[in-house]
């Protein structure tokens, strides 16, 4: 990083002259010769408090420990030949090599979008829009849709493009999401992946992020003899340093410098690793996986700006790096968990590892109120663990959720406190806590537990005015979550709901959101309910998607009402139905008929456009007009359940 600086001991001088025009070849030759006596072999000792993130080794390696085989590609083998119906129109074609872009690991039964999900969509549109997928959105529902979109086996969209380019992009996006397991599953399912440098580099980066230096170095050792890119040169130099071959690593660094390579952070860290001296990094605003791996090996303290990165995979690695301060690890961990790349148990462990003074532990609620931040949330979590009285537990959870809602971390904080929340017994003394508990359990999908608290609130509402008002405010959210039988509530009662909440803070904004969500899910909102909102401002400023994306989403959703086109051809095995790539599609398509939405035209396109319309801010920050278009589009393609999940996220993030 040109803008980054590292203070380290003076570099050893090797007295090299300026490189000539063939210096690149010299560098590679020197590195290959240096590798001859022995390949990089060091494996860093496991960190003291690191999340277990080991990945299965590449198939070509032979580690001592046996591991379970990677999932096979979902490209079904042809079944026994069966006669076609008399008169059936088929086209004879030669069975072609399988296109790697069609490979996937998620079956329809597991949530895959089906082999025809790109039917009707051009390759140019996919190549243009898929790289813009909002991989760092803090929405569990969006992340689930992205994962299904990227892991589903499907016929590649039609158009001219390099074979293998789409599968590589899908794996890159999974890795960018921090879903290293999903990326590895897809990698191992690709035939002849060893010939694709782009895929091998993704594999190496994933292993550096997972602190799996041993296998990353195996990849680098094999690649350095064939490829001269600076990435593999630097990776191999790091591996030499890990193996204790510091003179060879220093020679490689000097040669790269002679060539004019610019990466002083990397060079200084490698030199510090060789000299066994601590490196003091002043700045590293956009770290690469290799930077983090070298810094960890060199025990270099990560600078404060390292969390400027907004990449889930990078944040996850920072959160589990022992060479980062507690404050940095907590901030990175909260953001990584919210983006779905870090297990919630790891965040809980980091919360419990934070240290606090006796004064802070004695007054946790006031401390958290005064200084909202990662350490304050850690303090509240620590406090909740030592409380044994249900009322005290409820007070801590309620305060934590209230502060998290203000800070945009509501869903993540609910996941952290969920085990404790489920242990708090509903009682008459805790009626005040029931609305908060119900909302938190709704967004967690814990509907049975939510129902117990809801029934407590409903029973209390018969004699307690506060409980009655709380119930009235909660009923629309309960209906939105799927509780259709609750007090026979319908949208006709929205006018009464408005009277209950209209004096509260941002009532008009919340009503607009709620009405839009119901309308998008196909539940009629009375005209009179909308009319009451006309008393507010007549103009508002909102962030809207580009008009072209807005139009295309409506077009794709409406086009999905027609069944997907399928071309039936006969291969050289004349009685097997295959597509143009020679893949048996009848079995997957037959199974897909039972899944809602599967087999529709532009299914994948509609999902992709919906995710782009919501953007990185997710449903919690989307304007009601945008939400309405996205949810109705998903409903049109048969994804009503997914639309409702997004609606719940939006409603609770919006204060409903």
Provide a role label for each language-model segment.
Residues 177, 210-211, 243, 444, ...:
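Structural motif corresponding to the intra-repeat A-B loop/turn of tetratricopeptide repeats
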Residues 180-183, 213-217, 246-252, 449-453, ...:
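Solenoid-repeat scaffolds in large eukaryotic assemblies
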Residues 173, 202-207, 239-240, 440, ...:
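Residue-level signature for tetratricopeptide repeat
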Residues 215-309, 475-495:
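Extended amphipathic alpha-helical segments with heptad-repeat/coiled-coil character used for oligomerization
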Residues 38, 47-161, 165-168, 330-352, ...:
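Long, acidic/serine-threonine-rich intrinsically disordered regions with weak helical/coil propensity
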Residues 298, 302-509:
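Extended alpha-helical solenoid scaffold regions that build the rod-like backbones
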Residues 111-121, 135, 150-159, 185-195, ...:
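Solenoid-like repeat scaffolds
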Residues 160-167, 192-202, 226-235, 262-268, ...:
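Generic helix N-cap/helix-start motif at coil->alpha-helix transitions
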